[in-house]
């Protein structure tokens, strides 16, 4: 297999640096580009400087140049940035791995439509563990569909800008689908004041922000006399980076299509 030429968007950020480190360590991948936001003080620096390495790849804000030199773009940025990168990827036939969260439904529709022209994987969480957890939740939701209240509690670092997290929403969507509903029909986001008794048909969400928490997610099935908790905790972003590389390898066998990590891992 030839080496995958991979570019990283948001290259100077926490996740971007982890992705660069993972690409440099992968025997089947080459760092082909490092994209950063316009105005970033890191522009022009070597992408491996934070590791004390010289990669020969400088941080740039030129998406056209990056896409001209890469075959894959891994993007964990923000929705507006990802959509701009998507346009360039379509022009240059670059395959996309998208871990960005916070998309609106119309924006998600744009990503799905792009799958008709290029190959892309979109997932709110690239971790293998989280995606196996989704299968556990699908099974549990069917068993606890009656007589159990469902709550999703997530915690992230103080810098996270969207809530609930994309992973929490993905968990809610999985549970809702397993019980024949849509999340829009049953989600309750936070509670305040006199809320009245809990509607047993709802799925509740609570979000915690603080410190350097990488990502904790717990789904609580609360019945009478017992509680079942399914929890996933991320100790570092390494699992996200390794999952993103796994997604890129999966895309090597596809010219077009819209996929998620369930497809990548063969969990469907």
From Swiss-Prot:
EC number: 1.17.1.8
Family under the similarity heading: Belongs to the DapB family.
GO molecular function: 4-hydroxy-tetrahydrodipicolinate reductase; NAD binding; NADP binding; oxidoreductase activity, acting on CH or CH2 groups, NAD or NADP as acceptor
Protein species of origin: Burkholderia pseudomallei (strain K96243)
CDD domains per UniProt: DHDPR_N (cd02274)
Subcellular location: Cytoplasm
Keyword NAD found: yes
Its biological purpose: Catalyzes the conversion of 4-hydroxy-tetrahydrodipicolinate (HTPA) to tetrahydrodipicolinate.
Lineage summary: Bacteria, Pseudomonadati, Pseudomonadota, Betaproteobacteria, Burkholderiales
One Gene Ontology CC term in the entry: cytosol
One Pfam family matching this protein: DapB_N
Pathway: Amino-acid biosynthesis; L-lysine biosynthesis via DAP pathway; (S)-tetrahydrodipicolinate from L-aspartate: step 4/4
Keyword list, A-Z: Amino-acid biosynthesis, Cytoplasm, Diaminopimelate biosynthesis, Lysine biosynthesis, NAD, NADP, Oxidoreductase
Cross-referenced SUPFAM superfamilies: Glyceraldehyde-3-phosphate dehydrogenase-like, C-terminal domain, NAD(P)-binding Rossmann-fold domains
Record: residues binding NADP(+): 37
Name of protein: 4-hydroxy-tetrahydrodipicolinate reductase
Residues the entry annotates as binding (S)-2,3,4,5-tetrahydrodipicolinate: 157, 166-167
HAMAP family from the UniProt entry: DapB
UniProt: NAD(+) binding residues: 10-15, 36, 99-101, 123-126
Biological process per Gene Ontology, one example term: diaminopimelate biosynthetic process
Gene: dapB
Matching Gene3D superfamilies: Dihydrodipicolinate Reductase, domain 2 (3.30.360.10), NAD(P)-binding Rossmann-like Domain (3.40.50.720)
Active site: 156, 160
Substrates-to-products reaction catalysed: (S)-2,3,4,5-tetrahydrodipicolinate + NAD(+) + H2O = (2S,4S)-4-hydroxy-2,3,4,5-tetrahydrodipicolinate + NADH + H(+); (S)-2,3,4,5-tetrahydrodipicolinate + NADP(+) + H2O = (2S,4S)-4-hydroxy-2,3,4,5-tetrahydrodipicolinate + NADPH + H(+)
Keyword Oxidoreductase carried by entry: yes
């Amino acid at each position: 297999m030839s080496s995958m030429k991979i570019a990283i968007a948001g290259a100077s950020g926490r996740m971007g640096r982890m992705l660069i480190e993972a690409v440099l360590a992968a025997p089947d991948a080459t760092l082909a580009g490092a994209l950063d936001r316009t105005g970033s003080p890191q522009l022009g620096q070597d992408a491996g400087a934070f590791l004390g390495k010289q990669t020969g790849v400088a941080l740039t804000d030129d998406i056209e140049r990056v896409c001209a030199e890469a075959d894959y773009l891994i993007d964990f940025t923000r929705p507006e940035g990802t959509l701009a990168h998507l346009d360039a990827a379509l022009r240059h036939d670059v395959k996309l791995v998208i871990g960005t969260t916070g998309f609106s439904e119309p924006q998600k529709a744009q990503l799905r439509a792009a799958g008709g022209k290029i190959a892309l994987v979109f997932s709110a969480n690239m971790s293998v563990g989280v995606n196996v957890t989704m299968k556990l939740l699908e099974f549990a939701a069917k068993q606890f569909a009656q007589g159990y209240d469902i709550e999703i509690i997530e915690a992230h670092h103080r810098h996270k800008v969207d809530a609930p997290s994309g992973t929490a929403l993905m968990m809610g969507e999985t549970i809702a689908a397993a019980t024949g509903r849509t999340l829009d029909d049953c989600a309750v986001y936070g509670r305040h004041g006199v809320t009245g008794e809990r509607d047993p048909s709802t799925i509740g969400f609570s979000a915690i922000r603080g410190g350097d928490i990488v990502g904790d997610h717990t789904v609580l099935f609360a019945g009478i006399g017992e509680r079942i908790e399914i929890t996933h905790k991320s100790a570092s972003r390494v699992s996200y980076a390794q999952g993103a590389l796994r997604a890129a390898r999966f895309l090597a066998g596809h010219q077009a299509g819209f996929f998620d990590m369930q497809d990548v891992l063969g969990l469907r």
